[in-house]
Every structure is written in structure tokens, then in C-alpha cells.
UniProtKB/Swiss-Prot annotation:
It comes from the Eukaryota. This is Ubiquinol-cytochrome c reductase complex assembly factor 5. GO terms for cellular component: mitochondrial inner membrane; mitochondrion. Belongs to the UQCC5 family. It comes from Homo sapiens. Pfam families: UPF0640. The chain crosses the membrane at residues 20-41. The keyword DNA-binding does not apply. The gene is UQCC5. Associates with the mitochondrial ribosome. Interacts with UQCC6. Interacts with MT-CYB; interacts with newly synthesizes MT-CYB. Forms a complex, named COMB/coordinator of mitochondrial CYTB biogenesis, composed of UQCC1, UQCC2, UQCC4, UQCC5 and UQCC6; regulates MT-CYB synthesis and promotes its membrane insertion.
Amino acid sequence: MFTRAQVRRILQRVPGKQRFGIYRFLPFFFVLGGTMEWIMIKVRVGQETFYDVYRRKASERQYQRRLEDE
């Protein structure tokens, strides 16, 4: 694992500290978020993607609410 000094050294090597400050890390997180979104949309685990499961669960919840209201 990394020690605190090693992490600090790595973070200090990221350019733009004086001009952008802490915001110099934003592009990394933007790319990371985009990659996660792409994986959730495109990568199939078994036969389903994350959004397939989400849509199915939302539909099941809506159906259960209708049954409870009747």
C-alpha cells in the first residue's frame, strides 16, 4: 500500500497547483465518472446491464404500489 508521503508526492506532481488549486483534479474525476457511466450502460453482467435492472425494479415498485392502492 502507499504511505502518506508517497501519496503526497504523487499528488504534488499533478500540474496546475498554483493556477487551479484543488480544482486541478476535476478532469480526472470527470473521466472517471464518464467511464463508470459507460460501464453501467454497455457492460453486461450475465444478460443484464445496470439500467436494465433499474428499469425492471422501478416497474416492479410501480406495480406493487398499484396493487396496494386497489
